Design a protein with these regions (language model features):
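Extracellular/oxidizing-compartment recognition motifs
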Residues: 1-359
Length: 361
């Protein structure tokens, strides 16, 4: 057996089901192979795996090891797979220690909220996991480094019924002594602030972005510690002065605060956060592959129309992020627009994009 998966994922670290589904593939040369029996063995140590049964109880925040043995149509053992792993996350609301937080602004306020907390670790860390739920999108940082490779997390739901949370391994980002955890929240699908297709601007769940975060630490001496969102966090706004899932972002670099997401930053002028109610009654693990950068593309051509207007063509349609390196005086405004078509003279054609969905900044 090869390609072992738990809940259809390879080596997942954030499962919230007590009865996961195990799958695998047969890789062999026998075309008429038929499996007559299989046995899954599971345990918290790779050296002590026991037969898996339906009444086996899994614990939250635990790594499990498993393999599978397959018998062929003649009743002979075909082979035993290599050992795979998965980790459970949270099974119920009482597994969470944190509180939902936001800032003091309402849903029409445009600048994106930023949050941070400094903390000190006095012991050697064995492993660390962070669990993040957000009404809106989040970018999470620990000691100034972005957590994970995913973008646009968490995924879309009916935000007044169910919110997804994402689990990250952040062991390598932490250090003994002073540390900091920080995040910036985007509106995403949760708070569309302009007229939009399917009337998202009138969605019943619309509200200011908010988050729930829990950093769970296990030390080498076997003890654990949890650092979670609560009243001790601080909040401010910064360079993201506008963000919209349809029409884009406005970013003002003059509002940047260097080191805001790192340890040692002075957040004494930041405001205290507002502890708020949960936006939905149900929290569920996001059990799907994340949206990630899989390829970097270079423009195929560049056409200059004036000293202030350039068109870069990639000659293909794709979803992605743009990276542009520029020089200019502070306060210089640069507008980056995207489109799927070009006009006959090579200029950008946005006529096939609804006016309210065109990028504004």
């Amino acid at each position: 057996p090869v390609n072992l998966r738990t809940e259809y994922l390879r080596e997942p670290i954030g499962l919230d089901t007590k009865s996961p589904r195990f799958t695998w593939e047969y890789k062999g040369s026998e075309k008429n192979f038929l499996a007559s029996r299989s046995e899954i063995r599971i345990g918290t140590s790779p050296d002590n795996l026991q037969p898996y049964t339906d009444n086996m109880t899994l614990e939250p925040h635990t790594r499990y090891y498993w393999n599978v043995t397959v018998w062929d149509q003649d009743g002979d053992i075909c082979e035993t797979s290599e050992t795979a792993t998965f980790e459970t996350a949270k099974f119920k609301s009482s597994d969470w220690s944190g509180k939902w937080i936001t800032d003091s602004h309402d849903k029409e306020f445009e600048p994106a909220p930023m949050f941070r907390k400094a903390f000190t670790l006095g012991k050697e860390i064995e492993e660390a996991r962070v669990y993040v739920a957000a009404a809106g999108y989040y970018d999470l940082f620990i000691n100034g480094k972005r957590v994970g490779e995913n973008y646009l997390d968490p995924g879309y739901t009916h935000f007044d019924k169910r919110i997804l949370y994402v689990t990250h391994d952040v062991t390598s980002l932490l250090k003994p002594g002073g540390n900091a955890i920080a995040t910036v929240l985007g509106n995403g699908w949760h708070n569309v602030q302009s007229k939009a297709v399917w009337n998202f601007e009138t969605a019943r769940w619309r509200n200011r972005p908010r988050m729930l975060c829990e950093l769970r630490l296990r030390y080498t001496d076997g003890t654990t510690e949890v650092i979670a969102t609560d009243e001790s966090w601080h909040t401010a706004t910064g360079p993201y002065t506008y963000n919209n899932i349809y029409s884009g972002d406005k970013y003002d670099a003059t509002l940047e605060e260097n080191g805001w997401n790192a340890e040692g930053f002075d957040d004494s002028k930041w405001d205290p956060v507002q502890v708020t109610e949960a936006p939905a009654p149900l929290l569920a693990a996001q059990q799907m592959p994340g949206i990630r950068i899989t390829e970097e593309l270079q423009p195929v051509s560049m056409k200059k129309f004036s000293d202030k207007l350039y068109v870069f063509s990639f000659e293909k349609n794709f979803a992605g992020l743009s990276r542009l390196k520029v020089k200019g005086a502070p306060g210089t405004r640069i507008t980056l627009k995207h489109g799927e078509l070009l006009k006959t003279d090579g200029r950008l054609e946005q006529g096939n994009i609804r006016s309210e969905e065109r990028r504004v900044g």
